[in-house]
Amino acid sequence: VTEASTEPVGTFCLVLHTHLPWLAHHGAWPVGEEWLHQAWATSYLPVLDVLDRLALEGRRNLLTLGMTPVLAAQLDDPWFVDEFRTWLGFWQVRAESLASHRDPSMRALGSREFVASQRALAAMAGAWSGGLSPVLRPLVDSGAIELLGGPAAHPFQPLLDRPWQRFALRAGLDDTTLRVGRRPEGIWAPECGYLPGLEEDYAALGVRRFLVDGPTLQGAGGTTADAVTVGDSDVVAFARDLEVTYRVWSPRKGYPGGRWYRDFHTFDHASGFRPARVTSTATPSHEKAAYDPQRAAEAVRVDAADFVDVVRRRLVDLAAERQGRPGLVVAAYDTELFGHWWHEGPQWLEAVLRALPEAGVRVTTLAGAVEAGHVAGPRHLGAGSWGSGKDWRVWDGEAVADLVDDNERLRDRVLKVLAIPTPDRDPVRDQLARSTLLALSSDWAFMVTKDSAAGYARDRHDRHHREARLLADLVERGDTTAAGSLAARLRAVDGPFGHLDARLLPGSA
């Protein structure tokens, strides 16, 4: 009798990209701080709770977590931590207001929301009392997750000049190092944006791996079943397997659209809560059925089992195509999908992470995939992104041509102003660099192109540009008093990356 093989059928890597732009002090509703509060309460708390629970069971190499420096700065900010606690308190009050509602389903909704708010408040009084980093660091130290860093304020790197590209990435890596005590070896390249030659700057800054979208690698003759070394470097690129990734969520379909899941778009406007299930995509909001958490939990079990089956079948097929050599599947998503957009997402995530190893699939991180030998190459990749068309059109298309021009002029202007050497750090120059980085965030162009809170995005773009130009004018004129006063006011509102040293920018060339 031959014993069944205990070798895994292949390797699966789940990558979660955790990002929101700098929102602190820039409006509340409907876009602004409210956006971050909701994502914090419904995604970041429950997703990290899932990871912590699995880590306490001794599980390691669960997934790869990208955490952008600009988001981490907000989740660690004592002011924002206090603001979030206040927001959670109002959440609880809103839940209590449903206790006497005449509709039993609304009373049940209030009870669920009250319990959820209690759980969140307890987390903020406990492990999260000091912000994100005290929660994140043990997961990194224990090997439960691999943490990806990235450029400071999430710029679309292919559109940056080399000095700014290196400066933003160095600042971001430094920031993550300060927060978790170790320098990331991998990064999430914002928007999976790639330009040939970026790997050279990655290598120079100690980055050993990054992600691109599947078509970027496939266009170079590669396959998503292997990571590759890029160009003449030793830097490794991983690519999303879109066949598997899109099973969960794509621009047109995915599990969150299932009829039993909570509907994201239907609100009880008096309380602000979501009382309905999807029912069907064609059902008007006022006709959607009440949410049933038990039926939703059953849907989670069904969809988790389906995903495990999809991953396993994909890996079995890859092994057959590769004469028995195990393949790699990388699925990558925004963390905010799990909990915020898809209420049941954290439950599904936990179920999948438990079930995949039982199905004979090796679950690991990007670093673990390298150690397991899933690296081919080299490949010379072409330009790409994970946006519409898999090119750069979202960030350099006609709808945002004026933003692109503004960014180019600002980069050139500030680079010239900061090129004059200074022996000591200057808080005015540091703030000029900081304001410029915030102006260059990829989010503003994305929101305009997608017409998603486009007015807010244009306002943010214009404001950061206006403030940076004014500060540059004062520096050039030598008006140290006015420049110092303006820089201090800006720092009070836009003050992430306190370690930022503008003297490093000219030297990045």
What is the predicted role of each segment?
Residues 2-62, 67-112, 116-119, 222-509:
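Active-site and substrate-binding clefts of carbohydrate-active enzymes
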Residues 6-8, 52-60, 131-148, 177-180, ...:
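Acidic (Asp/Glu)-rich catalytic clusters
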Residues 66-71, 151-153, 186-195, 366-371:
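Short, solvent-exposed turn/loop segments enriched in Gly/Ser/Thr/Pro and often Arg
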Residues 149-171:
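Glycine-rich phosphate-binding "P-loop"
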Residues 165-189, 310-323, 327-332:
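CE4/NodB-like, metal-dependent polysaccharide N-deacetylase domain
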Residues 183-194, 334-338, 453:
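Conserved short loop/turn motifs at secondary-structure junctions
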Residues 193, 198-207:
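Hydrophobic, small-residue-rich alpha-helical packing segments that form membrane-like cores
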Residues 208-219, 362-365:
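His/Asp/Glu-enriched short active-site or ligand-binding loop at hydrolase and phosphoryl-transfer sites
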